Amino acid sequence: MDSNTVSSFQVDCFLWHVRKRFADQELGDAPFLDRLRRDQKSLRGRGSTLGLDIETATRAGKQIVERILEKESNEALKMTIASLPALRYLTDMTLEEMSRDWFMLMPKQKVAGSLCIRMDQAIMDKTIILKANFSVIFDRLETLILLRAFTEEGAIVGEISPLPSLPGHTDEDVKNAIGVLIGGLEWNDNTVRVSETLQRFAWRSSNEGGRPSLPPKQKRKMARTTESEV
């Protein structure tokens, strides 16, 4: 196993522990708690894949961070922070909408790279809006936290989420996954619309109604893709 992979996991575990202690003091805002919950799932998946104990890795990560901080001057820290690009966290959904459990009458699931696409194929003739919470850097989608499809009544009928065991995805991966979800929902004569933030950062091209501009041929192809259940 690559040593960098192990040490990266150890540092991530320790930093998550620090963030958790911060949240335990009720100091974290909603986006902070969002990321904390998602990162916990990711660390569990990575730990299982690597065969590493999280508690042991956290202790090792603490030692690594302490060694780095011992050598870090305040001036170097200021320069590092100044050189970092500005990261923004955008939220379409409330914490309740993100954490709410939902069920599917006719479940369909597809894995596309490191993203899992789920939808209820029993939903027909509904108006559906896609909402997402994600981070943006350099005016582009950087990391998808969670995307969900809601009916006008507020029911959840679809979802795109990162796989905890396969971290890392591009904005193009997210765009393709959204296309698959839209295609599957439109196959049952649902009308799918996209939130303004998703229009701006994930699609950049939509009609006035907020619906992504997908060619009919592409829509049919994406819908057929969802026919096979994983």
From Swiss-Prot:
Region of interest called RNA-binding and homodimerization, as start-end residue ranges on this chain: 1-73
Post-translational modification: Upon interferon induction, ISGylated via host HERC5; this results in the impairment of NS1 interaction with RNA targets due to its inability to form homodimers and to interact with host EIF2AK2/PKR.
Annotated GO CC locations: host cell cytoplasm; host cell nucleus
InterPro entries: NS1 (IPR004208), NS1A (IPR000256), NS1A_effect_dom-like_sf (IPR038064), uS15_NS1_RNA-bd_sf (IPR009068)
Pfam family, one: Flu_NS1
Molecular function as annotated in GO: protein serine/threonine kinase inhibitor activity; RNA binding
Region (CPSF4-binding): 180-215
Residue positions of motif Nuclear localization signal: 34-38
Keywords on record: Eukaryotic host gene expression shutoff by virus, Host cytoplasm, Host gene expression shutoff by virus, Host mRNA suppression by virus, Host nucleus, Host-virus interaction, Inhibition of host innate immune response by virus, Inhibition of host interferon signaling pathway by virus, Inhibition of host PKR by virus, Inhibition of host pre-mRNA processing by virus, Inhibition of host RIG-I by virus, Inhibition of host RLR pathway by virus, Interferon antiviral system evasion, RNA-binding, Ubl conjugation, Viral immunoevasion
UniProt key word Heme: no
GO BP, sorted A to Z: symbiont-mediated suppression of host cytoplasmic pattern recognition receptor signaling pathway via inhibition of RIG-I activity; symbiont-mediated suppression of host gene expression; symbiont-mediated suppression of host mRNA processing; symbiont-mediated suppression of host PKR/eIFalpha signaling; symbiont-mediated suppression of host type I interferon-mediated signaling pathway
Motif Nuclear export signal mapped to chain: 137-146
Domain notes: The dsRNA-binding region is required for suppression of RNA silencing.
Reported function: Inhibits post-transcriptional processing of cellular pre-mRNA, by binding and inhibiting two cellular proteins that are required for the 3'-end processing of cellular pre-mRNAs: the 30 kDa cleavage and polyadenylation specificity factor/CPSF4 and the poly(A)-binding protein 2/PABPN1. In turn, unprocessed 3' end pre-mRNAs accumulate in the host nucleus and are no longer exported to the cytoplasm. Cellular protein synthesis is thereby shut off very early after virus infection.
This protein's name: Non-structural protein 1
Lineage: Viruses, Riboviria, Orthornavirae, Negarnaviricota, Polyploviricotina
Gene name for this UniProt entry: NS
